Amino acid sequence: MGALYCLAGLPGSGKTTFAESFLSEHPGMEYFSPDQYYEKINGDECDRRNTFEVWHAMFGDIHKAEVEGKDVLIDSDNITYAQRTQWLEWFPNFEAHHLMYFERPFELCLERVNSRRRTIPKEVMLAKLGAWDSPVDAPDRHRWDSVVCL
């Protein structure tokens, strides 16, 4: 059976940059990001319509990888305990579940997000910061095979 690697952190914290490097070191690993699915379904990752279809397609593909015993990397914000726990509950048949999280200064994240094609308003970023549940004290920490701050 494969392993599930889940990234967590604010937008702009370095998740996707890390993912690119991690994937190059782990050939054959499947990569899943909502941005990919917005691009595939809507034709543009900035077009945030069809949210249900995007997540439904992504979850279906992750399930297929789980059944096939593949390793997967999930690149999404996963800022709350509930968002992270869903991966454990929906995909329990992976051999291992690893959480890798990023805590960066808010202003750095905001600066990085504002340099992208798809920007996020400061108010939305502040709301995400306020919702951030640090994995250090999370009640589900013991359910992960490893929890690493990168």
What does each of the following model-derived ranges do?
Residues G2, G28, G69, F94-A96:
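A general structural motif
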Residues K40-D44, E66, I79-R118:
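ATP-dependent NMP and nucleoside kinases share a basic, alpha-helical "lid"
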Residues C6, F32, D75:
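Conserved Rossmann-like nucleotide-binding pocket used by diverse enzymes
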Residues N50-A57, I79, Q83, V124:
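Soluble or luminal CAZymes and related metallo-dependent hydrolases
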Residues G2-A8, S13-T16, S21, E25, ...:
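Conserved GTP-binding G-domain of TRAFAC-class P-loop NTPases and closely related GTPase folds
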Residues D71-S76, L99:
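Short catalytic-loop micro-motif centered on adjacent basic/acidic residues
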Residues Q36, S76-N78:
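Short strand-turn motif at the edge of the Rossmann-like AdoMet-binding core
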Residues T17-K70, L108-L110:
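Conserved substrate/cofactor phosphate-moiety recognition/catalytic segment
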